Amino acid sequence: SVFREAAEGVRWLAGHRVVGSLALLGGLASVGYMLPFSVLVLFAGERLGLDAAGYGVLLAASALGGLAGSAIAAPLRARLGSRWTIAAALALGAASLAGLALTRDPIVAGILLALYILHAVVWSICATTLRQRLVPADLLGRVGAAGRVVSLLGLAAGSALGGALATSEIALPTLAGAVVFAGCAALAVFALRGPVDRAAAA
């Protein structure tokens, strides 16, 4: 049944240190993502002084980071390995959100958001590639579904928490997101230790 297959995916995920850690990182990163992005339109208006057109330009500028991230992810992983590429990307996510929480300059905010999206693309590509190499082919769909559930729960939690924090200070969700990503970077260094890339290639 569907539930039995889902349970099998969860059990396998929980029993594998690296893939389970990637799922945990994905859930936490989803919280960190939704903390600022659940209130980004309000942040852009109240903190950056942007109207609807300006907000659109801000998002368009941030998308450039995604293009850059897709271009550099594979070379970075080949040079640094999955562990340090993922950790560095998550650290960049933390730094970009910390800067965004402090700035009131729309141009600086656009650059920081582009760096944030760059981190998200690099982290996602590396994590997905590593997971696909480590999970047996017959379990890939079930384990992937279990990981997506963890991420969806993180999105829901981050959205609710972001809205609650914004009622006291509009920049607070962004700062909280930076803290979450800093924790994710530290967790990645610890949890992905060992020859994870050689294990994936085996």
Residue ranges of each PLM-predicted region?
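Conserved aromatic/hydrophobic "specificity hotspots" at molecular recognition or selectivity sites
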Residues: 1-2
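C-terminal transmembrane bundle of multi-pass solute transporters/carriers
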Residues: 7, 14, 22, 28, ...
